[in-house]
Amino acid sequence: MNENNDDINNLNTPCVLVLDSVVRNNCIKMNERAASLGVNVRPHMKTHKTIEIGKYQFEENKNLNKSRGIIVSTLSEGKFFSKEFKDILYATPIAPNKVKDAYQLHLSIDRLNVMFDNIEHLKSMVDYAIKNPNEFQKKWSVFLKIDCGYHRAGADPKLQSTTDLVELIVNGEYNQYFQFQGIYSHSGHSYKCQTPTDIKNLAIEEARVTGDYGKKLKSLGYKVDTVSIGSTPVCSHLPHNLLSEYGVNEIHPGNYTFYDQMQYELGNCKLEDIGVHVLATIVSIYPERNELLVDAGSLALSSDPGCTHLRDLKVINNFGIVYNDTNLRIVAPSQEVSKIQSTNQSPIDFSKYKIGSKIRIIPNHSCLTAAMFSDYHVINNDNQIINSFKPNKHW
Amino acid sequence: MNENNDDINNLNTPCVLVLDSVVRNNCIKMNERAASLGVNVRPHMKTHKTIEIGKYQFEENKNLNKSRGIIVSTLSEGKFFSKEFKDILYATPIAPNKVKDAYQLHLSIDRLNVMFDNIEHLKSMVDYAIKNPNEFQKKWSVFLKIDCGYHRAGADPKLQSTTDLVELIVNGEYNQYFQFQGIYSHSGHSYKCQTPTDIKNLAIEEARVTGDYGKKLKSLGYKVDTVSIGSTPVCSHLPHNLLSEYGVNEIHPGNYTFYDQMQYELGNCKLEDIGVHVLATIVSIYPERNELLVDAGSLALSSDPGCTHLRDLKVINNFGIVYNDTNLRIVAPSQEVSKIQSTNQSPIDFSKYKIGSKIRIIPNHSCLTAAMFSDYHVINNDNQIINSFKPNKHW
């Protein structure tokens, strides 16, 4: 509402603040880490969904990924980012109802890479090619999604049927339709780890499972350009011999642009590395209950409970903490308001936290929180608004 | 994407379906229930956020509320609904940074009623009136929010300081600025009840606490036009003597338009009363793990865990169930995809659930789920798309 004014205290609340230099620094650090290991970063766009931060993920030439390949979580994101990026990986196994749109996007850029983990995905793409012979001008560009132990998506690399899919598109009857790019895994189970050591071990495990399967495919004579692993926790604890020992040549983190309370609790970032805050206003105070009420509820913060498995039983309910006063936490988000209590029951300073005071909330899960907003207010280190980024929305 | 086609199977997924006759019937039944008790329904708009369903909430003249008074959860909603409704209650204690916008809205319709539960709310409204003497043409219309035991917002009716606030605006130095409309409570703790009997008892408790305070104010000589209680669970189990015994003359439910899995688990509706489903596509299948993967994740369903306190320890993870096959449930939503398992571990029928098959998901919490979408596809009893409703978004 007050975009002409650069003072965040005049913003309509709830709204989201993006800390520009923090986000840029997160991007640079991830790129430097990967470059030191000799691997590409194929950054995921899903956390921020903005062209501007997508560019930050390649800034200063620290990213070895010269094709500026990116990953998106929806086809809507794919179309949105195609204005700037021409090598896009759509990271969900392709459903038949998305084949047509995916192929149109593929034709419009260098390549839209799509995922398969079942023969039905291949069949529906072949079916499209056969039914649209005039339109089918270039092969589908595909990655095999493999399950590295997360058990959400991906084919089992131990099964012969998985390798049979690769054979089918490389040497078999489907070879005229497909360009095989490589393999991809996602270690989402890293968010359930207890300690940084657990994450480190999981990183080794993902590198081994995915890397070994890449080696196996190569030993069978297949060309495997890309062996890609990831999740922000694993990408924060990569083994030094990722490329030399395991043959993994790409990582694909996403959340690291913003980080959040979960990444902090897992030990993957410091509080000052968190690049997104929700600005809220205290709408009432209840000194008799030692509580505040703010105008940011589930529709501003999301209702993700975060890493409850890492918390003391007394502080399980923690849907965000207050920036610069991390003893204060969101304990109960309703749709449009949330209750704030102090974790250790110490008295809240009501001379500081008054009706009308602004607070900044560090979210549990920045991917979900950022997605709640249509505009990001981008601020500098002096808390002045320097830009507005508009994320892609919906599907 | 295929709005010209009335077949839901051609819709881009994920998307939301609104079951027109179910929603209308929910509205009629709530109005009939209230009318039989002789009380108004002041319907809440926050669950659906659409003008069309707002009108359904007054259809067939079953609602005794002749001023067509409604409730909204944000000022953005207030402005949106002011096109159709002229008596609006903004249900969050008014923060100083929202006073100006609230007063503009108040001037533009019959009345915007705002909430107070602390003297600071009154002070900021008086401050605005004093600083804008030419603009201040009509008194602020206000409700006192009282705490009926939920302990989220509201002044304590047992404290003299609460009644002092009423005195201040009715007879005291602030009387030139305010029109006192009545009192309002919200029994959000009804969502933590174990059984319908518990909810019934809570309804009596809210009616007693709020109704008694209304009687007290009247006995002190104050005019109290409205004594309003609510929450969909409580409004589903109202005592027959709500008006005659307790003096409560208004209820303000919202979720009842759509209902959801939580309301079903609490015993407030049947599965067939749930008026909103998320349509999703199966993007992959994993027979070896007896699992499906669908393209509706936390950004389509929300990550609200629902009424975990009512569930068997084995089925705590339930972020939505499959319509017409309620043994299948969302066990793990990620940002854009979710895993589905069968609750009793029985084998999923993979001849029915194939890659590309559509499923309809009954959400845990319809208020949060509906808010994830920019368009509602409205369907009739034959599952044909008959309309598109566009909800108010953001703040």
UniProtKB/Swiss-Prot annotation, chains A, B:
Binding positions (pyridoxal 5'-phosphate): 184, 191, 232, 254-255
Top-rank taxon, per record: Eukaryota
GO-annotated biological processes: cellular detoxification; D-serine catabolic process
Reactions catalysed, as given in the entry: D-serine = pyruvate + NH4(+)
Record has Cytoplasm as a keyword: no
InterPro entries: Ala_racemase_N (IPR001608), D-amino_acid_metab_enzyme (IPR051466), D-ser_dehydrat-like_dom (IPR026956), D-ser_dehydrat-like_sf (IPR042208), PLP-binding_barrel (IPR029066)
Amino acids binding Zn(2+): 365, 367
Keyword Isomerase applies: no
Residues recorded as bearing N6-(pyridoxal phosphate)lysine in the entry: 46
Cofactor: pyridoxal 5'-phosphate; Zn(2+)
UniProt keywords, alphabetically: Detoxification, Lyase, Metal-binding, Pyridoxal phosphate, Zinc
MF terms (GO), sorted A to Z: D-serine ammonia-lyase activity; metal ion binding
Phenotypic effect of disruption: Knockout leads to a loss of D-serine degradation activity and an accumulation of D-serine within the organism. Delays development with a prolonged period spent at the mound stage and decreased spore formation. Decreases expression of acaA and carA-1 during starvation.
Enzyme Commission designation: 4.3.1.18
Protein task: Catalyzes the conversion of D-serine to pyruvate and ammonia. Plays a role in D-serine detoxification.
Family assignment from sequence similarity: Belongs to the DSD1 family.
Protein's recorded name: D-serine dehydratase
Organism: Dictyostelium discoideum (Social amoeba)
